[in-house]
Amino acid sequence: MSLALAQRLQKAIQKIPKQHPDAILQLNEGASEADFSALEAAIWLQLPEDIKEVYRVCNGQSEDSAFLFAGQEWLSLARIGEEWSVWKGLYDSGDFPNEEEGQSAPDAAAVRPLWWSPKWIPFTHDGAGNHLCWDFDPSDEGNTGQVIHYYHDDALIEL
């Protein structure tokens, strides 16, 4: 199953120049095992194999590249670690409101109602503090690794 996800990504990337000839897509070379080890040590989590397979194909994109995800930069493993560290620092310093004040979208019962969790791993960035994240801390109704849209200045989290 994980290889299928990586293959689908490759096929989608191959279509971009045909569908958007003006887009300049600059993808990074695939990640190494050392890249995975460094990130996993930093975030205290083991990445699932399907995510690793995707990052073995492309380790995110250049900051100068056209966005692969609508309006957001696809982060390399190193940039994931950097972004996660910023959020973890804010979390550790108590900058987030009481967890009970966080909320997810009404249709996103699968997401814990938190302002932020150290187990939300950002893999995109829009330049304004908003991310798509892998959610490794879902509610009982959610799935580990589900993708959530995190807004830095709003308690609304979308699945």
Model-derived features with residue positions:
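A surface-exposed partner-binding patch
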Residues: M1-G127
